[in-house]
Amino acid sequence: MNKVDAWLSKHDLKNLTTLIVVGAFILFLILLFMLMNHSDQGSNRITVSENAELRTGPNAAYPVIYQVEKGDTFTRLSKSGKWIEVESRDGSEKSWIAGWHTSLNIEAGANKKVNPLKNKVIVLDPGHGGNDQGASSNTSKKSLEKNYTLKTAKELRRALEKAGATVKLTRSDDTYVSLDDRKLNGDAYISIHNDSLDSPNANGATVYWYKNNQEALAETLNTNIQKKAMLFNRGTRQENFQVLRQTNKPAVLLELGYISNPTDEVMIRNQIHRQVVEEAVVDGLKQYFAS
C-alpha cells in the first residue's frame, strides 16, 4: 500500500470533499470582497454630464472657482442637498458642483425651472443727483457721475422688468435725494455709482457689502460682472456705507468703473458696455435667487 492509499484509508473521503467546498467558499468570499471594494472606489468618481461650474459652497450664490466641461471626472467627497462636494483637479482644494450637472442623475427640481426673479422686488439706487453731481471726468466736466448712474439704473430697470422682477428707483430724474430717503423695501438693494480719484491711473469695478447677509449677493454679482464686463475686477469689499447699513435686506453698492480714468470713462459712457454690465447684474440676481 503506497502513501496515498494509506492517507485515503486513514481519512474519510467525505471530509476531504467538505474541505474542498469550504476552501472554495472562502476563496469566493475573498473575490467578492475585492470586487465590492473596487466597486466602492469607482462609485466615488463622478462624471460631469454637461458644461458647469465648480463653486466654493453648495449653492449658486457661492463664487465660481473654475469652469468644468462635459466628460470631466472628479472624486466625490460628500453631499449637501442636491450639491456634491468634490476634490479639485489638483487635489489641493474642495469645491461643489450641482448634482444635476453630473452622472448621479439628480434632477434640478421644479424650483430650478421657474423664473427666479418672478415676484422679486429689486431696489435700484442711482447715486447722487440734483445739486450732488458726484464724481466728474478729468477731461470733461460734462461727464458727471449722477447722469451715468441714472442712465444705468433706468436701463437696468428695463432689463430686470423684462426678466420678471418688480423694480423700484430711489430717484427717477435729476433730483437730490438724501441718504435717509433712499431706504426702500425690496428683496434686494443695489446702489449704483462710479468711482473717482485725483490720479487717472486707478480703474476697475468694485462691489461693496456691509452686513453678513449681503456678502453672498456681492460675491455673486462680482463673479458675473467679472465674466462679462471689460472693467478691471477689484473684487468685493466690506464697507460701512449708510445705504448698506440702513437695510436688513441683501444689499450692495456697485462702483462700476472710475470716471477719472480715461479708459473706464469710455466704457461708462458707452451704452453697449453698460448693457453688458447690466446683463451681468441680471444674471447674478437670477443666480442668487435661484440658490
UniProtKB/Swiss-Prot annotation:
The keyword Secreted is assigned to this record:
yes
Q: Describe the location of the MurNAc-LAA domain by residue ranges.
A: 122-286
**Cross-referenced SUPFAM superfamilies:** Zn-dependent exopeptidases
Signal peptide annotation: 1-40
| PROSITE patterns reported in the protein's UniProt record | SH3B
What EC numbers are recorded for this enzyme? 3.5.1.-
Question: Which is a Pfam family this sequence falls into?
Answer: Amidase_3
Question: From what superkingdom does this record's organism come?
Answer: Bacteria
Query: InterPro entries, alphabetically?
Result: LytH, MurNAc-LAA_cat, N-acetylmuramoyl_amidase_3, SH3-like_bac-type
SMART domains hit by this protein: Ami_3, SH3b
Q: Which CDD domains match?
A: MurNAc-LAA
- Annotated compartments: Secreted
Quote the Gene3D superfamilies the UniProt record gives: SH3 Domains, Zn-dependent exopeptidases
A single GO BP term for this record reads: peptidoglycan catabolic process
Residue ranges of domain SH3b in the record: 41-105
Q: State one molecular function term (GO).
A: N-acetylmuramoyl-L-alanine amidase activity
Extract the ranges annotated as region (Disordered): 124-146
Q: What are the record's GO terms for cellular component? A: extracellular region; outer membrane-bounded periplasmic space
Alphabetically ordered keywords of this record:
Cell wall biogenesis/degradation, Hydrolase, Secreted, Signal
Instruction: Report the record's disulfide bonds.
Output: none
| PANTHER family in alphabetical order | CELL WALL AMIDASE LYTH-RELATED, N-ACETYLMURAMOYL-L-ALANINE AMIDASE
What is the role of the protein in this entry? Probably involved in cell-wall metabolism.
UniProt similarity note? Belongs to the N-acetylmuramoyl-L-alanine amidase 3 family.
Q: What is this protein called?
A: Probable cell wall amidase LytH
> Which organism is this protein's natural source?
Staphylococcus haemolyticus (strain JCSC1435)
- Which gene produces this protein? lytH
